Structure formats: C-alpha cells, structure tokens
C-alpha cells in the first residue's frame, strides 16, 4: 500500500513519493508533504525551466536555480515563469 501524504501543492491526501527526491532539507520536505501527482506536475515544469532558461546540467548554478524553483513551485504562492515564456499552442 502506498504511503499517503496531505499534499501541500494539491490540497488533498494522495499517495506520497517512494523516496526523497533530493539529498537535502528540501528533498525531505517534498518527501513528507508532496504527492506523486504533484511531483509529475513538477517534472513538466522542470522541463520547461530547463528549456526556457537554457540551463546546462554541467553548470553548478543550475542545481541552485532548480532548487529555488522547486521550493517556489511546491511551497510558494505561485511558481514564477521565465520572463520570455510563451505557452505552447493549445492542441485542438
């Protein structure tokens, strides 16, 4: 049976993550209070951040930026989008 958490992002009790996503305090907070569903939303947001900011995994600043964005996404009022971000056209 999945471990349940009261998801801070989605506001309801849902299955939690199987492990801490990061080996730091933020990773523990996410593990304790973020659901698998919210984590899937983060992964999509994460890809957008990497692309829009043109971040390189080899750059040490990338990790710092991603941790800041994850903190804001999960625990802030609203995640900030990159200044020049344009959402993809809707499929329809």
UniProtKB/Swiss-Prot annotation:
Similarity-based family: Belongs to the Fe(2+)-trafficking protein family.
Role, per record: Could be a mediator in iron transactions between iron acquisition and iron-requiring processes, such as synthesis and/or repair of Fe-S clusters in biosynthetic enzymes.
A Gene Ontology cellular-component term: cytosol
Statement: the UniProt record of this protein carries the keyword Iron: yes
InterPro entries: Fe_traffick_prot_YggX, Fe_traffick_prot_YggX_sf
SUPFAM superfamilies the UniProt entry points to: YggX-like
GO molecular function, one term: iron ion binding
Protein name: Probable Fe(2+)-trafficking protein
Keyword Glycoprotein part of the UniProt annotation: no
UniProt-listed GO biological process terms: cellular response to oxidative stress
